[in-house]
Every structure is written in C-alpha cells, then in structure tokens.
Amino acid sequence: MKPRFAISSLSPAWLLAGLLWLLPGCKSDIDPARLENLRDDLDAVITGARGAPPPEDAARGGWDTEVFGARAQETLEAFAHLLDSPPGKAPADGLLAEEFTSSALRPAGLEETFRDRHFIVRKAPAGKQAASRKGRDGLEAALGELLEAFAGSTGRHSKLKLFEVALGDGNSARTRTYFQLGGRFEEGTFQVKATWLSNWTRAGERWLLKSTEVESYEEAIGLTGAESLFTDCTKASLAGSAAFRSQLLPGLDHWMGRIELRMGIDIGGWQGLAIGDIDGDGRDDLYVCQPGGLPNRLFVQNTDGTVTERSAELGVDWLESTHSALFVDLDNDGDQDLLVGLEPGVLIHENDGKGRFTPKTARLLPAALPYSLAATDYDLDGDLDVYVCCYNRRKGANRHLVFARPVPYHDANNGGRNVLLRNDGRWRFSHATVRAGLDANNRRFSYAAAWEDFDNDGDQDLYVANDFGRNNLYRNDSGRFTDIAATAGAEDISPGMSSCWGDYDNDGLMDLYVSNMFSSAGNRITSQGRFHQGASEETRAQFRRHARGNTLLKNMGNGAFSDVSEAAGITIGRWAWGSKFADLNNDGWEDLLVTNGFITQQDTGDL
C-alpha cells in the first residue's frame, strides 16, 4: 500500500484568538453597517436567533404548528401503516371526527400516461375528488380499495411526508402530505405516490381528522422477468473479491471505530468512484475512493463480468483520504489516465496502456480540500483541462467534522476556492483560475461541476452546484469565463449537490438538472409567519426555496433558462446527491437517475 501523501496545514485558530483579544483595546475603523451585516449573517446560522427554526422541543419554543404537525403525522401514519406488510397495529378510536369524509384514496378513472415494455404509469384526472367515504368505515373502505391494487404483493412499505401546516382559528387546521406506498409482485413492482389535503378539528386537547382529499395521484408498475430494466449484480460481480468482502462490506461504522479521525476518516462518507477501461480490453473497470486509513481499490473487470482487485499491483492503492477520481486521456495517447483527489491536492497518473499507473505530477491545493473533478478542453488547445471543486476551506486536522459552517446558512460565501488546472502538455498543469475568470463568486461550498456548450458557440461552458446557496453558470468566451447565473435565471439558491446536462425535451438545446435537498420540515417551517420575522421577504423566500428540492432548468435558447421543476414533477428527490441524464429505455428521450439518502446505520430513523 502507498504511504500517506500529505502536507502540513497550520491552523489559524491561535491567530484569530489573539486578534479577538486585542480588538477591544484597538481603535476600530470598521463601518457599523458592515458590522450589522455580519450580525445578520451570524443570526442565520445560530439556532433560535431572531426567529430562526425551532429547537428540538417545539412546544417550549412556541412553535404550535410543529407541535400540531407531529400529532397530525402520527395520526396519518397510524392509518397508512395498515397498508404495510405486515400491517401496522389498528389505530385507536378517537382519531376521526364524527363528520369525517374522504375521497377515494385510489381515484376512479385513472388515465394511462406512459407505457413501454418496462413500465406502465397511470394518473388521476385533474379536478377535485368527491368526498364519497364517510366515517371510520368509509376511511377503512378507502384504504381497502387502495390495498386491492396491491393484492398478492409482498414487502409493502408506506411513507408520509407532512410538508404544509396551517392553523386556523385555534380549533381548525389544514395539512398537506406526500404519501408513497410500494410493493413487490412476482411479475413486477407497484408504486403509488399521492398528495393528501387534510382538514382537522380540535376536540379539547385532541386534534381529530375531519377530512382527507387526494389532490394528486400517480401509480407506476415496473415489469420484471425478461423485461427487467435493471438487475442487481453486485454480488455476482464483486463477492469473489476479498477486498470487497473485508473492506467495503463492513461499512463505515465498522472502520470509524478502528481508525483515528486524524487519518482522514469521518462519518459523512464523502467518497466517490470512477469508471473507465484502463487496459483497452473493451470492459469498464472500477476505481473506488476510500476514507483515510483505507486503501483505494481498483476492480478490474474479467471476461465473465467478475472483477479482480489490483490497486496495489497497478500503483493506485493510496491511503490518503480520497473524495474523487476521474479516468480521462490527459496525454492524447489513447488510454485512460487517472486523476485522484487526495486530501492535499490532485495526484495525476499516467497509464502505460496496460492499466499500470505512474504518478507524474501533483497539484497541491493548500487553501481548500478537493471534492470532485470535471475535465474538458476549455481553451480548445487539443488537451483536457481539469476543474476541481473544493467545498471546504482547510481547518487543520479537524478539517470537516461532517458538516460545514456556512455564513449565512442559505446563501453562504465562506466556502473553499475552486481551482482550474490548465493542461500545458508534457504532464505540466498550471493554476489558471484567476486568469480564466473563474475566481468570480468562487467562495461557495461547491460539490460538483458539469461542462457543456449550452449556448452552442463551440466552447465548453461550466455549471457549478453549490451547497448552502447560489450556483454558478460560467459562460466561456474564447477561454475567458463570466458568471451569468443571475442574469440567466440559473442561480437556483439551494443546497446544491450535483448537476447534469441533457436535452430532456428534444429541442436541440441542452437543459440543466440540479439535485438539491427536499425537506418536509423546511417546507413547513419556512412558510410560517413567525419564521425569521425580522428578515426581508426576499430572504424568507430564499429559505423557502432552499427546502423545495431538485431543479430542472429549461434552456430557452437566448442565453437564459426557465425553471420548469414543478411542472415536470422532479422536485422531490429527497436528500439527493448524484444525478445523471440517460435514455434508459432507448425511446429517444432522456430519463433521469437521482441517488439519494445520507447516513445509513442500524437506526431506522437514519436518512
């Protein structure tokens, strides 16, 4: 295994402490207005300050909407879990108002909107659904009608996300909830997603469900067997590898208890992977990045689809914390070279054509940690250049601690500095960020970037997805970039996680998809009147936008984009990460793959 490849990093904490100690005795030339702006920024990240989100004890914090919302969620889940397999415990009496009414939970007259050999999709027609079910018997009948569609299924699981709460005169309330139910059959899978509008009435200390109406409904059938679109081949391909069994399968929790944090391991699991044909045999191979203290792994594909782990043999088993890697041909010799984003910077390897790698150069990044890599020939000189997203500024040994400290939370500008590495040939790479114009608005928390010629002028433009705020759209004009995200309608102020380009509507123009985080709690809280009462309406709207979810930006062909996310139905990707346009069913239309989740442990409440 390779030794640790590291540079020292001096923490500025002692210097900052000294400056703070000296400040009271120094004459200040700081503009009071700037101090007030700083206070506002700090308020945005201090829980409970100036009407910020509620503490864990919502009742103590005076957030009656959250107290009620928790009760409403419990009531709705009690009924929804009757649909699970095995079904949940029957709800107690006294949860429904005597005058309770409900529409059918699986509306009649479903319209088929899509069919191919893999999927069938049906939707409820637009319009208000009749409240035809009454009382507890009516609700149980509505649940039973929905369950009939799942007759014979196994593994049924329901999920509710209560995303809107409105309290009325003290005795009435309204909620909106996203509902999803899925199950498996021998011949396929079945999934339902719907939006429920519910009204509530108070009876003493209790809240009773008064009515439920299905505002939207969609069901999708996935056909398996010979027509299965995907097959999980993880075990068939990787289980024969000792490295897979002993290192990857135990999971991060296992290694967190065995490797010191200062080696570069943390619970976030911020590691990526790279795919490429390293030896020219026509089969893709897999490079898996690992946290500090564990060697990166290179799985070379065999003729039968299994893999052989060869990282040490081929010279790429680095032990340094690695967030990203990329296979690209950097020297134009026809094989896939390797870039690896290690903790100190980017290490660049040459491929000998047979899959054996030799480190040729390293570009240290002393200001920030490299998180992701994207390559293109931005200056049209015939070789590939590299853009490095750097997310966090360096903080010494405690460089990450799972979450960043953005200021202000929803529009942070205190992140890492991204870097453009220009390929000057003969394995020489120079820092070209400033001279190329890419240092403008370059202190965000950048997770990912995607190159594309969105304006069809012959050069590659760059979109950067930033966590905690606005994104960047850098238009390329003959190798010089200008950030036009604001004027182009492409800032998408959100917790950006990834971005990808694709012509989703087949109009010849490349459109843009950005994965963010959908938060039901964020939607509820930011819509309340008491949320950040001292902030401007613009700031409040930005917080609401932050919780909305994913974004689809349609290229209008005039240098601008239109947000069509809600009309296209793509906002709810949960806590989304990587995303990719791909025509999965070969029908000529770009589909979307979106990964989601975060920390997976034995606790079922984990994301």
What do these predicted regions represent?
Residues C26-L607:
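Acidic, glycine/proline-rich Ca2+-coordinating loop motifs
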Residues P12-L23:
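Bacterial N-terminal signal peptides
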Residues S8-P12, K27:
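Intrinsically disordered, low-complexity proline-rich regions
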Residues M1-S8:
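N-terminal secretory signal peptides that target proteins for export/translocation
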